[in-house]
Protein backbone atom coordinates (compact mmCIF):
# COMPACT_ATOMS: atom_id res chain seq x y z
CA UNK A 1 0.00 0.00 0.00
CA UNK A 2 1.47 3.38 -1.07
CA UNK A 3 0.43 5.08 2.12
CA UNK A 4 1.25 5.46 5.79
CA UNK A 5 4.13 3.55 7.32
CA UNK A 6 4.65 1.54 4.12
CA UNK A 7 6.06 4.59 2.35
CA UNK A 8 7.87 6.07 5.33
CA UNK A 9 5.15 8.23 6.87
CA UNK A 10 3.95 8.19 10.46
CA UNK A 11 1.53 5.45 11.45
CA UNK A 12 -1.52 7.64 11.96
CA UNK A 13 -5.26 7.21 11.67
CA UNK A 14 -6.58 8.03 9.15
CA UNK A 15 -3.59 6.91 7.09
CA UNK A 16 -1.42 9.53 5.40
CA UNK A 17 -1.73 8.98 1.66
CA UNK A 18 1.46 8.62 -0.35
CA UNK A 19 2.02 9.08 -4.07
CA UNK A 20 4.11 7.54 -6.85
CA UNK A 21 7.23 9.37 -5.64
CA UNK A 22 7.01 8.09 -2.08
CA UNK A 23 6.33 4.60 -3.37
CA UNK A 24 9.28 4.63 -5.75
CA UNK A 25 11.59 5.72 -2.92
CA UNK A 26 11.04 2.36 -1.24
CA UNK A 27 11.88 0.18 -4.25
CA UNK A 28 15.02 -1.88 -3.71
CA UNK A 29 15.41 -0.86 -0.06
CA UNK A 30 16.19 -3.45 2.59
CA UNK A 31 14.28 -1.30 5.07
CA UNK A 32 11.69 1.44 4.84
CA UNK A 33 13.09 4.88 4.03
CA UNK A 34 11.57 7.48 6.36
CA UNK A 35 9.96 10.57 4.89
CA UNK A 36 11.11 13.83 6.46
CA UNK A 37 7.97 14.35 8.59
CA UNK A 38 8.61 10.98 10.24
CA UNK A 39 12.29 11.81 10.71
CA UNK A 40 11.32 15.01 12.53
CA UNK A 41 8.69 13.21 14.61
CA UNK A 42 11.20 10.50 15.56
CA UNK A 43 13.61 13.21 16.71
CA UNK A 44 10.88 14.70 18.89
CA UNK A 45 10.13 11.29 20.41
CA UNK A 46 13.81 10.63 21.09
CA UNK A 47 14.44 14.13 22.41
CA UNK A 48 17.09 14.96 19.80
CA UNK A 49 14.80 17.61 18.28
CA UNK A 50 15.39 19.75 21.35
CA UNK A 51 19.15 19.45 20.86
CA UNK A 52 19.04 20.23 17.13
CA UNK A 53 22.08 22.36 16.38
CA UNK A 54 20.54 24.64 13.75
CA UNK A 55 17.42 25.40 15.77
CA UNK A 56 19.31 25.90 19.02
CA UNK A 57 21.88 28.19 17.44
CA UNK A 58 19.26 30.53 15.99
CA UNK A 59 17.18 30.58 19.18
CA UNK A 60 20.14 31.02 21.53
CA UNK A 61 21.55 33.83 19.37
CA UNK A 62 18.21 35.64 19.47
CA UNK A 63 18.00 35.21 23.24
CA UNK A 64 21.53 36.53 23.70
CA UNK A 65 20.97 39.51 21.39
CA UNK A 66 17.41 40.19 22.62
CA UNK A 67 16.16 40.05 19.03
CA UNK A 68 12.80 38.58 18.09
CA UNK A 69 12.15 35.03 16.97
CA UNK A 70 9.68 35.07 14.10
CA UNK A 71 8.33 31.84 12.70
CA UNK A 72 5.71 30.60 10.27
CA UNK A 73 3.59 27.45 10.29
CA UNK A 74 0.74 26.19 8.12
CA UNK A 75 -2.21 25.42 10.41
CA UNK A 76 -2.89 21.79 9.49
CA UNK A 77 -1.60 18.29 10.05
CA UNK A 78 -3.18 17.14 13.31
CA UNK A 79 -4.33 13.84 11.77
CA UNK A 80 -3.42 11.85 8.70
CA UNK A 81 -6.19 13.32 6.57
CA UNK A 82 -6.28 17.02 7.48
CA UNK A 83 -3.21 18.30 5.72
CA UNK A 84 0.17 17.07 6.94
CA UNK A 85 1.41 17.69 3.41
CA UNK A 86 3.45 20.76 4.32
CA UNK A 87 3.32 20.77 8.12
CA UNK A 88 2.64 18.54 11.11
CA UNK A 89 0.98 19.79 14.29
CA UNK A 90 3.26 17.85 16.62
CA UNK A 91 6.23 19.71 15.10
CA UNK A 92 4.63 23.00 16.15
CA UNK A 93 3.99 21.62 19.64
CA UNK A 94 7.64 20.62 19.98
CA UNK A 95 8.91 23.96 18.70
CA UNK A 96 6.78 25.90 21.17
CA UNK A 97 8.04 23.68 23.98
CA UNK A 98 11.60 24.44 22.87
CA UNK A 99 11.02 28.19 22.75
CA UNK A 100 8.84 28.75 25.79
CA UNK A 101 9.71 25.89 28.15
CA UNK A 102 13.33 25.07 27.37
CA UNK A 103 14.52 28.62 26.58
CA UNK A 104 11.84 30.39 28.62
CA UNK A 105 11.65 33.23 26.13
CA UNK A 106 9.22 36.03 26.96
CA UNK A 107 6.11 36.17 24.79
CA UNK A 108 7.03 39.63 23.50
CA UNK A 109 10.15 38.13 21.91
CA UNK A 110 8.23 35.57 19.81
CA UNK A 111 6.08 36.37 16.76
CA UNK A 112 4.16 33.72 14.83
CA UNK A 113 2.77 33.90 11.32
CA UNK A 114 -0.16 31.47 11.17
CA UNK A 115 -0.86 30.42 7.59
CA UNK A 116 -4.36 29.15 6.84
CA UNK A 117 -4.64 26.01 4.70
CA UNK A 118 -8.05 25.39 3.11
CA UNK A 119 -6.54 23.24 0.37
CA UNK A 120 -5.09 20.05 1.86
CA UNK A 121 -7.51 20.39 4.77
CA UNK A 122 -11.14 21.53 4.76
CA UNK A 123 -11.81 24.85 3.03
CA UNK A 124 -13.16 26.41 6.25
CA UNK A 125 -11.22 24.29 8.75
CA UNK A 126 -9.43 27.24 10.36
CA UNK A 127 -12.55 27.95 12.41
CA UNK A 128 -14.82 24.97 11.65
CA UNK A 129 -14.61 21.49 13.15
CA UNK A 130 -14.60 18.78 10.51
CA UNK A 131 -14.61 14.99 11.06
CA UNK A 132 -12.70 15.02 14.30
CA UNK A 133 -10.30 17.71 13.18
CA UNK A 134 -10.44 21.32 12.03
CA UNK A 135 -10.85 24.42 14.20
CA UNK A 136 -7.13 24.99 13.78
CA UNK A 137 -7.30 28.54 15.09
CA UNK A 138 -8.97 27.26 18.26
CA UNK A 139 -6.36 24.53 18.57
CA UNK A 140 -3.63 27.15 18.20
CA UNK A 141 -5.20 29.35 20.86
CA UNK A 142 -5.34 26.41 23.27
CA UNK A 143 -1.76 25.41 22.47
CA UNK A 144 -0.37 28.91 22.96
CA UNK A 145 -2.46 29.20 26.10
CA UNK A 146 -0.41 26.44 27.72
CA UNK A 147 2.47 28.93 27.79
CA UNK A 148 0.28 32.00 28.37
CA UNK A 149 1.53 33.05 24.95
CA UNK A 150 -1.57 33.96 22.94
CA UNK A 151 -0.03 37.34 22.21
CA UNK A 152 2.74 35.66 20.23
CA UNK A 153 0.28 35.24 17.35
CA UNK A 154 1.35 38.17 15.22
CA UNK A 155 0.05 37.57 11.70
CA UNK A 156 -2.60 35.48 9.94
CA UNK A 157 -2.71 34.98 6.18
CA UNK A 158 -4.00 32.51 3.58
CA UNK A 159 -1.60 30.09 1.95
CA UNK A 160 -2.28 31.25 -1.61
CA UNK A 161 -0.38 34.42 -0.69
CA UNK A 162 2.11 33.20 1.93
CA UNK A 163 2.97 29.89 0.23
CA UNK A 164 2.83 30.75 -3.45
CA UNK A 165 4.85 28.39 -5.66
CA UNK A 166 4.17 30.25 -8.92
CA UNK A 167 6.48 33.14 -8.02
CA UNK A 168 3.86 35.88 -8.28
CA UNK A 169 5.63 39.02 -7.13
CA UNK A 170 2.37 40.57 -5.94
CA UNK A 171 1.84 37.66 -3.53
CA UNK A 172 5.41 37.79 -2.25
CA UNK A 173 5.26 41.57 -1.77
CA UNK A 174 1.96 41.30 0.13
CA UNK A 175 3.48 38.68 2.42
CA UNK A 176 6.59 40.81 2.94
CA UNK A 177 4.52 43.91 3.69
CA UNK A 178 2.55 42.02 6.33
CA UNK A 179 5.70 40.80 8.08
CA UNK A 180 7.39 44.19 7.99
CA UNK A 181 4.47 46.14 9.42
CA UNK A 182 3.07 47.83 6.35
CA UNK A 183 -0.61 48.83 6.40
CA UNK A 184 -2.75 45.72 6.82
CA UNK A 185 -6.05 44.83 8.49
CA UNK A 186 -5.24 45.14 12.19
CA UNK A 187 -7.05 43.45 15.09
CA UNK A 188 -6.17 42.68 18.69
CA UNK A 189 -7.58 39.23 19.54
CA UNK A 190 -8.25 35.70 18.34
CA UNK A 191 -11.98 36.47 18.39
CA UNK A 192 -11.53 39.37 16.00
CA UNK A 193 -9.50 37.14 13.69
CA UNK A 194 -12.35 34.62 13.74
CA UNK A 195 -14.85 37.34 12.86
CA UNK A 196 -12.83 38.39 9.82
CA UNK A 197 -12.40 34.80 8.66
CA UNK A 198 -16.09 34.02 9.19
CA UNK A 199 -17.12 37.09 7.20
CA UNK A 200 -14.73 36.10 4.42
CA UNK A 201 -16.24 32.61 4.35
CA UNK A 202 -19.70 34.14 4.08
CA UNK A 203 -18.50 36.12 1.08
CA UNK A 204 -17.28 32.97 -0.67
CA UNK A 205 -13.62 33.17 0.25
CA UNK A 206 -11.97 30.01 1.60
CA UNK A 207 -9.13 29.74 4.10
CA UNK A 208 -6.36 29.72 1.53
CA UNK A 209 -7.44 33.14 0.23
CA UNK A 210 -7.90 34.97 3.55
CA UNK A 211 -6.38 38.45 3.33
CA UNK A 212 -3.47 39.42 5.63
CA UNK A 213 -4.28 40.19 9.25
CA UNK A 214 -1.94 41.75 11.82
CA UNK A 215 -2.55 41.42 15.57
CA UNK A 216 -1.49 44.17 17.94
CA UNK A 217 -0.43 43.38 21.49
CA UNK A 218 -2.30 44.65 24.54
CA UNK A 219 0.11 47.58 24.77
CA UNK A 220 -0.88 48.61 21.25
CA UNK A 221 2.41 47.69 19.57
CA UNK A 222 2.20 46.23 16.09
CA UNK A 223 4.28 43.15 15.18
CA UNK A 224 7.19 43.91 12.88
CA UNK A 225 9.99 41.81 11.46
CA UNK A 226 13.07 43.87 12.34
CA UNK A 227 16.69 44.01 11.24
CA UNK A 228 18.76 41.23 12.80
CA UNK A 229 15.75 39.17 13.89
CA UNK A 230 15.55 35.40 13.60
CA UNK A 231 13.10 33.76 11.19
CA UNK A 232 12.28 30.06 11.38
CA UNK A 233 10.12 28.24 8.82
CA UNK A 234 8.51 25.10 10.25
CA UNK A 235 6.94 23.87 6.99
CA UNK A 236 8.80 20.87 5.60
CA UNK A 237 7.81 20.71 1.92
CA UNK A 238 10.07 22.89 -0.17
CA UNK A 239 8.11 24.00 -3.22
CA UNK A 240 5.85 26.50 -1.46
CA UNK A 241 8.54 27.92 0.83
CA UNK A 242 11.17 29.09 -1.66
CA UNK A 243 9.59 32.43 -2.52
CA UNK A 244 9.20 33.46 1.14
CA UNK A 245 12.71 32.44 2.18
CA UNK A 246 14.02 33.97 -1.03
CA UNK A 247 12.73 37.45 -0.30
CA UNK A 248 13.56 37.25 3.40
CA UNK A 249 17.14 36.20 2.62
CA UNK A 250 17.49 38.89 -0.05
CA UNK A 251 17.97 36.23 -2.74
CA UNK A 252 17.00 38.55 -5.56
CA UNK A 253 18.98 36.74 -8.28
CA UNK A 254 17.45 33.38 -7.33
CA UNK A 255 13.93 34.80 -7.39
CA UNK A 256 14.64 36.48 -10.72
CA UNK A 257 15.76 33.23 -12.36
CA UNK A 258 12.96 31.16 -10.82
CA UNK A 259 10.27 33.65 -11.84
CA UNK A 260 11.66 34.05 -15.37
CA UNK A 261 11.61 30.28 -15.83
CA UNK A 262 7.86 30.55 -15.24
CA UNK A 263 7.38 33.42 -17.65
CA UNK A 264 7.21 36.10 -14.96
CA UNK A 265 9.23 39.27 -14.55
CA UNK A 266 9.92 40.69 -11.10
CA UNK A 267 10.78 44.27 -10.28
CA UNK A 268 12.40 43.05 -7.06
CA UNK A 269 13.62 46.44 -5.85
CA UNK A 270 11.78 45.95 -2.54
CA UNK A 271 13.92 42.88 -1.81
CA UNK A 272 16.95 45.12 -1.17
CA UNK A 273 15.82 45.48 2.44
CA UNK A 274 19.07 44.72 4.31
CA UNK A 275 17.19 42.99 7.11
CA UNK A 276 20.13 40.64 7.68
CA UNK A 277 17.88 38.01 9.24
CA UNK A 278 19.14 34.89 10.98
CA UNK A 279 17.13 32.32 9.00
CA UNK A 280 16.64 28.64 9.79
CA UNK A 281 14.36 26.29 7.86
CA UNK A 282 13.08 22.96 9.13
CA UNK A 283 13.95 21.34 5.77
CA UNK A 284 16.13 22.07 2.76
CA UNK A 285 14.27 24.27 0.26
CA UNK A 286 17.00 25.19 -2.24
CA UNK A 287 20.77 24.57 -2.04
CA UNK A 288 21.53 28.22 -2.85
CA UNK A 289 19.94 29.36 0.39
CA UNK A 290 22.67 27.61 2.38
CA UNK A 291 25.64 28.23 0.10
CA UNK A 292 24.92 31.85 -0.88
CA UNK A 293 22.55 33.33 1.71
CA UNK A 294 23.62 31.83 5.07
CA UNK A 295 20.34 30.02 5.69
CA UNK A 296 20.71 27.06 8.05
CA UNK A 297 18.69 23.84 7.83
CA UNK A 298 17.50 21.86 10.84
CA UNK A 299 16.94 18.59 8.96
CA UNK A 300 19.05 18.57 5.78
CA UNK A 301 18.23 16.24 2.91
CA UNK A 302 20.10 12.95 3.30
Residue spans for each PLM region:
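N-terminal and secondary-structure boundary signal
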Residues: 163-164
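Active-site nucleophile/metal-coordination loop of metallo-enzymes that catalyze phosphate/sulfate
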Residues: 1-80, 84-160, 170, 261-302
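Hard-cation-handling environments
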Residues: 145-147, 154-156, 167-302
Amino acid sequence: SASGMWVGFENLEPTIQGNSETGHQQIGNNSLASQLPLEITNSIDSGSFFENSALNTVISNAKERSTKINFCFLLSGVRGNDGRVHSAWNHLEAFLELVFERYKLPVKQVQMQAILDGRDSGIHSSITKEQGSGDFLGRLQNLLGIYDANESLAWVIGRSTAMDRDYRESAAKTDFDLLTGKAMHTVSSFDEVREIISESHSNGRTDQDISPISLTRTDGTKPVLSKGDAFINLNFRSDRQRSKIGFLAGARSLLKSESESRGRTWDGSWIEHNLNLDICTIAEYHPDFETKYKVTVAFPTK
